[in-house]
Amino acid sequence: MISNISKKILSNSSKFIQQQSYSTKRIKVTGPVVEMDGDEQTRIMWESIKSKLIFPYVDITPEYYDLGLPNRDATNDQVTIDAANAIKRAKIGVKCATITPDEARVKEFGLKEMWKSPNGTIRNILDGTVFRGPIICKNLPLLVPGWKKPIIIGRHAHGDQYKATDFVVNGPGKLEMIFTPSQGEPIKKVIYDFKGSGVAMGMYNTTSSITAFAHSCFQYAIDKKYPLYLSTKNTILKKYDGQFKDIFQEIYEREYSTKFGELGIWYEHRLIDDMVAFALKSEGGFVWACKNYDGDVQSDIVAQGYGSLGLMTSVLTNADGVFASEASHGTVTRHFREHQKGNETSTNSVASIFAWTSALGQRGKLDNNKDLVKFAQDMEKACVESIESGFMTKDLAICIKGNQVKRSNYLNTEEYINKVAEFYNKIK
């Protein structure tokens, strides 16, 4: 059920779009797309992207949800739940970056409480996997020069250390783990006999979540036509990580090996240390399935290896074919403060543009709308070609010029979006 507040927001968004005067040659979108608005500088860019790069070319009325922090607070975060359920129904969503409040934000916005991460809420409701991959521009230097193709990290963002129970052991004693089944005898394991103080932790995962993760990874690899690697430390965690390894292998052999063979791609399990070394020596061009902690760490390492967090895509998918995209960076608070002062900003909008094109491209694939798929591809090409032609925001100019960057070397926020529109109109 959609809350009354969300219905009102959706209605207002539809009226706004319908009031605009656009070309009659726009590409018609018949399938639903859920749009989730966000916060601060990314919210400002979001409106500009829609008005200059999306709505002039695409005839679409998104199902709109305002996930800006003030509205999440006003709805007691119900709007986030409504948005997640809407994505589940529509299959396609596109999200602007949002604030996850800490104590300082609670005070700044006068919040009722410290609301949870909207990404986490959406991910849990959809039981999805987050895939992060780079947008590669030939003229931007790479920290890992050999990475010529994308490395896409698929993170199993469920359980493990992130749902663990940990505590400090203050003195000697026996640490035990007990599982009490609903039927049958309890299972008791002695973990350690402490002679003094220390620390302890217990964590878990579920077969259903690992299975859904495996399906998402295999399906995403097929969509990208890239080989898939799963990394674990099953030589040490023989039961825990062994479960990941066994589930992936069983599902691959039963459901995906034939399709992988037809595409000339493959699946392979590797130890995490071996996989890290392989990734650094490779040229890229694969999907890397990681457990929760590994994915958290490796996704940031990979992002920096390609040169810029501003050129990273983020897609949430699940085994049911749900697809929700967003930029992998935050709300760019520092730039927003400058914007509030009336100062010029040069904020990189590429990842936010790709959030829209990824969602619309996937909608086009589901609806067999070839014009929409081509629009998405051409708009992405316009983003890359503009950068490769020397038109970019300050963060990317610094990657090339370093401390020698001058104002003439980069465009401001709106100038870059305008330049992308200019390049798109040449390409289409």
UniProtKB/Swiss-Prot annotation:
PROSITE patterns: IDH_IMDH. It comes from the Eukaryota. Mn(2+) binds at residues 273, 296. Transmembrane segments: none annotated. Gene3D superfamilies: Isopropylmalate Dehydrogenase. Its cofactor is Mg(2+); Mn(2+). PANTHER family: ISOCITRATE DEHYDROGENASE [NADP], MITOCHONDRIAL, NADP-SPECIFIC ISOCITRATE DEHYDROGENASE. Homodimer. Belongs to the isocitrate and isopropylmalate dehydrogenases family. This is Isocitrate dehydrogenase [NADP], mitochondrial. It comes from Dictyostelium discoideum.
